[in-house]
Amino acid sequence: MRTHYADKVDSSLIDQTITLCGWVHRRRDHGGLIFIDLRDREGLVQVVCNPTESTVFKVAESLRNEYVIKVTGKVHKRPEGTVNPHIPSGEVEIAASDITLLNKSKPLPFNIDEYQEVSEEVRLKFRYLDLRRPEVAQRLKMRSYIIREIRRFLDERGFLDIETPMLTKSTPEGARDYLVPSRTHPGQFFALPQSPQIFKEILMVAGFDRYYQIVRCFRDEDLRADRQPEFTQLDLEMSFVEEKDIQQLMETMIRHLFSTFLNVPLPDPFPRITYDEAIKTYGTDRPDLRNPLTLVDVTDLMKSVEFKVFKEPANNPHGRIAVLRLPKGAELSRKAIDDYTQFVGIYGAKGLAYIKVENIDNGTGGLHSPILKFLPENVIAEILKRTQAQSGDILFFGADKAKIVNESLGALRDRLCADLNLYEGQWKPVWVVDFPMFDREDVGDWQALHHPFTALQETDPEKVIANPGDVLSRAYDMVLNGSEIGGGSIRINDIGMQYAVFKVLGISKEMAEAQFGHLLMALQFGSPPLGGIAFGLDRLVAIMTGASSIRDVIAFPKTQTAQCPLTNAPAQVETLQLETLGLKVSKHRK
């Protein structure tokens, strides 16, 4: 029906007759002429309707926003002073010789042709209209281009695109599974995969050497901001590799994507920091390195002070005291400090002690704080020295269990940087390495920090069982501007070590065989050294397009309550369907 898309209409087509199809983005009457902005997938073109073309003009008079039309006409240069430099077709317009009305539109629930605040519920209910917005459509187009380039990059490097099952077995991977009842095997269930982890390892045992997949994953997680019950991963696995092989390849890919689509050079190589360094310095294992603020540990200085708020955590083996220095922060008002105190309370902090450094040259006389009277002068002097405090700064203190201090001051660090726009640079990638293999609260069972198939730096299974808290894994996360965009590891390919990890996690041999028997069997038939990584594709695209949420780069996302306003899913089903599956719905328990 058409000869061109809007973005291909330019001055090279002047005096040619072309045909366009699309929607009426905007219609304007000016001085006896009717101007129509025709919108298609690729952009906008201005169409001019002259009263001398009576049939065309009559159709144009009847048009409203979002009517679907086909326009044929000759390309003309726009009159002087009317050029629009912001669109590819901005130097020309179409003098319509024929307009066909292909379909009408009901009155719109919200405007598409201009910016308007619309609730997410309404946007998602009428997602087909929301997706017509050029800025929304552009993100999905960018997503498609990024995926296409990822495939090309990996195809050229010998990777095979292999699909893994969507209907698989429920295994304990952290989040709850989405279960699918089997009609042919009553009382038994498939699970939708949380990741292709086990299958991709088995593919390496099978000898495929380099695998990748753009794959849907499903996790029935508790509701959290900016999470989706179904999401997309770039998943890959390689044989006969070590950490550096995977990291170098993935750095090259990410650098290529940013150079290609954003014209942004990323560092070569990406910096690396250990998990321990990240937690101690930034309070998180996902540090935003654009943020110049850091945490400084002063636990050792507080072991002998009389101030119980500091002394108790300083002498608790699970405690920590850290300081966050904000340059020029002494200007903060009491209200601002109270607001930040309330903010860190979200993360379990019981308060937010502070010292304002009004004049560093006057010793304690140049300081202002309610806690000064509780601290010896030599301790205060060492705090100022260690934090490199300057006149005009403010020092915020966190004192509690290390987890609370890290999370609260880490969040405060991010909040202060955002509030005061302290960012240095635009893009700061980093690898976080040397993660603990196992983690637990003060008391409780050990859990795998990543997953139980992660290889360990310790090679003796007996030492792993004896001292699990001392064992580091061979895992690595790629973090960009405070978001983890990829995470992976070298995998265990030794059956004895795999059983040792299961033992630490409290998984008996019988339970392991029942849950992971297919993988454990495969490991005994010549498993190569292997490793891989998975990227959250939604997150990566959101970052690259500047979207505020991953929902903005997914065509049909769920809400934060895991519902689809467009289709009203999830929904009840007919009783007969349940009976066929041997299911009965019990009364919902809140």
From Swiss-Prot:
It comes from Coxiella burnetii (strain RSA 331 / Henzerling II). The keyword Lipid metabolism does not apply. L-aspartate binds at E173, R219, H450, R491. GO terms for biological process: aspartyl-tRNA aminoacylation. This is Aspartate--tRNA(Asp/Asn) ligase. The record marks H30, G81 as: Important for tRNA non-discrimination. Homodimer. GO terms for cellular component: cytoplasm. The gene is aspS.
